[in-house]
């Protein structure tokens, strides 16, 4: 198991942090604004 070998630990940690950061950036810039826009539009339509 490479997770337990100290030589690979920093590589796995760096890759994990990088992957989570990219995923968080993608979700925050593309997915959340579209979902928020959809929810606001639905609320406006319901209130009409």
Curated annotation (Swiss-Prot):
The record ties this protein, via InterPro entries, to: ATP_synth_su8_fun
Q: Which gene encodes it?
A: ATP8
Q: Does the keyword Flavoprotein apply?
A: no
Which keywords label this protein?
ATP synthesis, CF(0), Hydrogen ion transport, Ion transport, Membrane, Mitochondrion, Transmembrane, Transmembrane helix, Transport
Give the similarity note. Answer: Belongs to the ATPase protein 8 family.
Q: What is this protein called?
A: ATP synthase protein 8
GO annotation, cellular component aspect: mitochondrial membrane; proton-transporting ATP synthase complex
Q: What processes does the entry annotate via GO biological process terms? A: proton motive force-driven ATP synthesis
- Tagged with keyword Lyase: no
Q: Return the Pfam families for the record.
A: Fun_ATP-synt_8
Membrane-protein topology: Single-pass membrane protein
Say what the protein does. Answer: Mitochondrial membrane ATP synthase (F(1)F(0) ATP synthase or Complex V) produces ATP from ADP in the presence of a proton gradient across the membrane which is generated by electron transport complexes of the respiratory chain. F-type ATPases consist of two structural domains, F(1) - containing the extramembraneous catalytic core and F(0) - containing the membrane proton channel, linked together by a central stalk and a peripheral stalk. During catalysis, ATP synthesis in the catalytic domain of F(1) is coupled via a rotary mechanism of the central stalk subunits to proton translocation.
Transmembrane residue ranges = 12-32
Where's it found, cell-wise?
Answer: Mitochondrion membrane
């Amino acid at each position: 198991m490479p997770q337990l070998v100290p030589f690979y630990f920093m590589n796995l940690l760096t890759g994990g942090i990088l992957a989570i950061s990219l995923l968080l950036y993608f979700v925050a810039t593309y997915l959340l604004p579209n979902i928020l826009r959809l929810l606001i539009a639905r609320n406006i339509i319901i209130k009409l």
